[in-house]
């Protein structure tokens, strides 16, 4: 059994999702297309030709899904607000019907005793803004801040915990450099400019959120990976340093007041469109930092590739998930301690952590996923070890509440604690979901014991 006794008494136990991955209803109640609607409907971009048109049909099943959150024992739910549902024009007036949906969701969560954690951007940029340059232009940063203000003005009396962006690395590097995610570009200059305007949009949104809600608690969510060299050669050591810059430092340093890493500015060779005051805006003080963790990266030099000229290599004999990602819980502990010791972060949430496996529904209707149970236990134990060494970890959000549209992988990759039969929309709590609820109960029992003592 995992030793989780080091987790604080007020530890937040959550589950997480994202709008495009679960909502469906892409053309209902005034929602406009997002870049992911465009991307997923482009032949060859998503495995199986899958789209988010229906997904988990969460838009029509909110009460049922809130019930599942409670069944899993979670006391917090991290969801994202769909920008094209709330401001279909990208900028300008609010679509009342779109914002009403999140109003009902928040009220339902609070009635069920679940704390809402809202993410304002989880990759679904309105296509109308992409048509005008998307994140490669400064105006999108400004429109994002205006949209953030509109959402917080409506929900901020009940939602106190806000994330500006989810995994901006994926939006910039995978969406604009590697082309494997929307908008599907392969342009280093566009990618670097997008990274900058995502950061600027974050900083402007922090200002907008605080102006709209004086007691808001604001953070950002970054996906990070420990980086290790494949060998002790000078080339691999240098490649690991560049990969760390590309994956970690580029996304942490500016928002935490250190500016952009000069070695990576030189590596990319792209002029950043910095205006006076921008770096201060980007480094607006935060109340918490969100960490999404899935795997470490072991890299070797790749001089013929694109920036950062480092290529990930496989680990012989490693345990792998259905994503072919190595299971390495120690990496989560390493990152939590790095954020604490190197960056001085004062409050951290693990905002995503989870695994995909080839789940099978048994004859009796149950779904047994022992690999995911083990994964959960190992990563929560890593969290507890980090807390024991001083990490200010305030909570953990399992990815994901339920199986959903896994971006370019379509519906083949299942991350949920709850199984979804996409043909019928039937939800079934997996063994991992039952175990998660058990871990929450055990922690609550320890908390009551500490209080009684």
Regions found by a protein language model. Name each.
Residues 2-46, 70, 89-91, 99-453:
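Active-site region of glycoside hydrolase catalytic domains
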Residues 10-12, 59, 76:
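A common structural microfeature
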Residues 47-61, 138:
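Active-site mouth loops of central-metabolism enzymes
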Residues 58-65, 88, 98:
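Internal amphipathic alpha-helical repeat/solenoid segments
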Residues 61-82, 284, 288:
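Catalytic domains of carbohydrate-active enzymes, especially glycoside hydrolases
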Residues 81-94:
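Glycine-rich, proline-tolerant flexible connector loops at the mouths of alpha/beta enzymes
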């Amino acid at each position: 059994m995992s030793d989780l006794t080091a987790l604080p008494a007020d530890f937040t136990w959550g589950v997480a999702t994202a709008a495009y991955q679960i909502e469906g209803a892409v053309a209902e109640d005034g929602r406009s297309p997002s870049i992911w609607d465009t991307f997923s409907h482009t032949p060859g971009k998503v495995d199986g030709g899958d789209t988010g048109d229906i997904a988990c049909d969460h838009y029509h099943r909110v009460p049922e899904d809130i019930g599942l959150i409670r069944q899993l024992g979670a006391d917090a739910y991290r969801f994202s607000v769909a920008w094209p549902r709330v401001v279909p024009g990208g900028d300008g007036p609010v679509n009342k019907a779109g914002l009403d949906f999140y109003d009902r969701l928040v009220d339902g969560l609070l009635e069920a005793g679940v704390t809402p954690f809202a993410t304002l951007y989880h990759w679904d940029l309105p296509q109308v803004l992409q048509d005008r340059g998307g994140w490669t232009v400064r105006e999108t940063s400004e429109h994002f801040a205006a949209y953030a203000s509109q959402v917080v003005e409506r929900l901020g009396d009940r939602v106190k915990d806000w994330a500006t962006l989810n995994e901006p690395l994926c939006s910039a590097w995978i969406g604009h450099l590697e082309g494997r995610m929307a908008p599907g570009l392969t342009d280093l200059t566009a990618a670097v400019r997008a990274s900058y305007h995502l950061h600027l949009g974050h900083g402007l949104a922090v200002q907008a959120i605080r102006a709209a809600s004086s007691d808001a608690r604001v953070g950002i969510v970054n996906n990070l990976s420990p980086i290790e060299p494949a060998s002790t050669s000078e080339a691999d050591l240098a490649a690991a340093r560049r990969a760390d810059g590309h994956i970690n430092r580029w996304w942490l340093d500016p928002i935490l007041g250190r500016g952009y890493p000069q070695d990576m500015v030189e590596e990319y060779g792209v002029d950043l469109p910095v205006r006076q005051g921008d770096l201060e805006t980007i480094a607006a003080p935060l109340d918490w930092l969100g960490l999404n963790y899935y795997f470490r990266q072991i890299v070797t030099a790749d001089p013929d590739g694109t920036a950062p000229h480092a290529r990930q290599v496989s680990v012989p004999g490693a345990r792998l998930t259905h994503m072919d990602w190595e299971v390495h819980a120690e990496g989560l502990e390493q990152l939590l301690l790095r954020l604490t010791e190197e960056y001085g972060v004062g409050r951290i949430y693990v905002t995503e952590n989870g695994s995909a496996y080839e789940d099978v529904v048994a004859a009796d209707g149950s779904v047994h996923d022992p690999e995911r149970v083990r994964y959960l236990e190992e990563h929560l134990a890593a969290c507890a070890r980090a807390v024991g060494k001083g990490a200010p970890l305030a909570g953990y959000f399992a990815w994901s509440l339920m199986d959903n549209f896994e971006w370019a992988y379509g519906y083949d990759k299942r991350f949920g604690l709850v199984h979804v039969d996409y043909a019928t929309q039937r939800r079934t709590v997996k063994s991992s979901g039952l175990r998660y609820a058990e871990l929450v109960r055990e922690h609550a029992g320890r908390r009551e014991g500490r209080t009684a003592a």
